[in-house]
A protein has these predicted regions:
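Flexible "cap/lid" loop of the alpha/beta hydrolase fold
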Residues: 88, 92, 98-127
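Helix-turn-helix DNA-binding segment
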Residues: 247-290, 294-296, 303-306, 310-315
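Short beta-strand/loop motif that positions the catalytic acidic residue
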Residues: 185, 191-193
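Conserved HGGG/HGGXW glycine-rich cap/lid loop of the alpha/beta-hydrolase fold
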Residues: 1-48
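Conserved alpha/beta-hydrolase "acid-adjacent" motif
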Residues: 198-204
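Conserved acidic catalytic loop of the alpha/beta-hydrolase fold
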Residues: 57-75
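Hydrophobic, aromatic-rich cap/lid helix
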Residues: 151-180, 184
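Catalytic active-site module of serine/aspartate enzymes centered on a nucleophile-bearing elbow/loop
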Residues: 215-253
């Protein structure tokens, strides 16, 4: 099974966070049994952007870009804190592409998290003393019991972003709210709450689980802010035992994404328009079209659309 780790927005850096032992333990443990996919969201870490956008739709667009680039129809998603919101956004809109959803210390609305008095005061500090802010928010989450890991997370935050980008993120996340999407999430969902994280809320996690149709809430244990060995075992059991929704497979061996491209093709859209609508690159569209032509026995766009019409893939 492929698992995509959807990162805590503006707080991930693939190289820097590897210095935190708990990150390595968590990642390597899952990678023993699964195809693990780690990434930095656009605008942070190793995915810099001159003009990053932090609305949920833009953040969620990273997920299909990864799946398409790796030729994956479907994957499980692990949403890490704020990363849970783009994960839920994608899962609600693309039920056929998400097999399981794991939410770690996540929430449904910015007001559930960003309005936390402790966080509010910490975010205010970011405008006046960036280094002190990074140290303080890491220490606030983990407590003084784990100062070495907190320093590692603070260094990761400084590597992940810069003050200008972080303040833009804080402004855009004010409108974050996936409440209306939760009922549309069809996959089995595991909502995990770590009581040692002082910036998370058990009440909000329970509300989240109650609003998702096929969700289970569990209190969990952690190591330096990440799931520890017992919780990793719990996640593994969930991925193994939870029944996933079944979806009819497209004809001709077409992937779900290729069907998406074919449907856009039937509207008369150009490659550039398809790329924009599906949030993928033009090169990815061209690659999908090549596969579509081979699988449908078509030599051009018109023949491919006729195939789709015969197979009732388009209206």
């Amino acid at each position: 099974m492929a698992i995509v780790l959807v990162p805590n927005v503006q707080m991930s850096h693939l190289v820097s966070e590897w210095s935190v032992p708990a990150v390595r333990q968590f990642s390597l443990s899952l990678a023993r049994s699964h195809r693990l996919i780690r990434y930095d969201s656009t605008g942070s870490g190793l995915s810099p952007s001159a003009s990053p956008r932090f609305d949920l739709e833009s953040l969620a667009a990273d997920i299909p870009a990864l799946l398409d680039g790796l030729a994956l129809d479907r994957a499980a998603l692990f949403g890490n804190i704020t990363g849970g919101l783009p994960a839920m956004t994608f899962a609600a809109a693309n039920p056929g592409r998400v097999s399981h959803l794991v939410l770690w210390n996540s929430f449904a609305r910015n007001t559930d998290h960003g309005a936390n008095p402790r966080l509010t005061s910490l975010f205010a500090m970011a405008a006046t003393d960036w280094e002190l802010f990074t140290e303080s928010i890491s220490q606030a989450a983990l407590g003084w019991r784990d100062s070495e890991a907190a320093r590692g997370w603070a260094a990761t935050l400084r590597a992940a972003t810069e003050p200008v980008s972080f303040h833009r993120y804080l402004a855009e996340r004010q409108s974050w709210d996936v409440t209306d999407l939760l009922a549309h999430i069809q996959c089995p969902t595991l909502v995990l709450f770590d009581p040692t994280n002082r910036l998370a809320s058990e009440e909000r996690s329970r509300e989240l689980a109650a609003a998702i149709p096929n969700a289970t809430f569990m209190r969990a244990t952690s190591e330096s802010g990440m799931p520890d060995a017992p919780t990793i075992a719990l996640i593994e059991q969930f991925l193994r035992d939870a029944k996933t929704a079944t979806f009819d497979r497209p004809p001709g061996g077409l992937s779900l994404r290729e069907v998406d491209v074919l449907r856009e093709l039937a509207t008369g859209a150009t490659n550039a328009e398809i790329a924009e609508r599906l949030s993928i690159s033009i090169n990815t569209v061209a690659r999908h079209l090549t596969h579509i032509y081979v699988k449908t026995g078509s030599s051009n766009r018109v023949e491919a659309v006729r195939y789709a019409e015969r197979r009732e893939l388009v209206d």
